[in-house]
Amino acid sequence: SAAASAARRARLLNLLFARSSAAAAASAAASAGAGSGSGGFGLGSRFLGGGRGGSRAAASAVASAGASARGGGGGGGGSSSAAAAAAAAAAAARNANLRGWLVASGVGAGAGAGAGAGAGAGAGAGAGAGGGSGGGGGGGSGSGGSGGSGGSGGSGGNDGNDGNDGSSSRGVKLYAYDYYKDDKKGSND
């Protein structure tokens, strides 16, 4: 059915987002040892009840990456950490925007809303502290399909002429001109 198909699609999308969030967190955690700066970023989603949007989380991550690069314990290490953190921030922003679009359009709103929970990573300190949990799932209601439109009626056949006076000799008069011809014929007789 349509409801089962929508639920299946929602589960697959939420699984995809969960894996993407986990990959972003792992990338940020791996880059934490390269720089010695402090900071971190969390993935917030205003669509799942969080107070911050994806763009704010991305901006925070870029700022954190810059601080990590400035305070890094080596030129190569700091730039590597900044690049990895920036890539993780971009992935987090894309995740938040896609999830927001799906929730706003009603796709996957009721299945596993917590799959996109924030994944933060503290640069230089080791493991980062993750952000918030997702909001509870709401039941998705589907609207019924619209009824089909009725077929158009067939057009009537043309009246035949008898070849003498040009008036209709059979059939139902469908047009005002038929009446006009008969009236005119009667007035001339």
From Swiss-Prot:
Its main location: secreted. Keywords: Secreted. This is Alanine and glycine-rich protein. It comes from Mytilus californianus (California mussel). It is found in: Secreted. Component of the organic matrix of calcified shell layers like nacre and prisms. Residues 127-170 are annotated as: Disordered. GO terms for cellular component: extracellular region. Residues 127-160 have a biased composition (Gly residues).
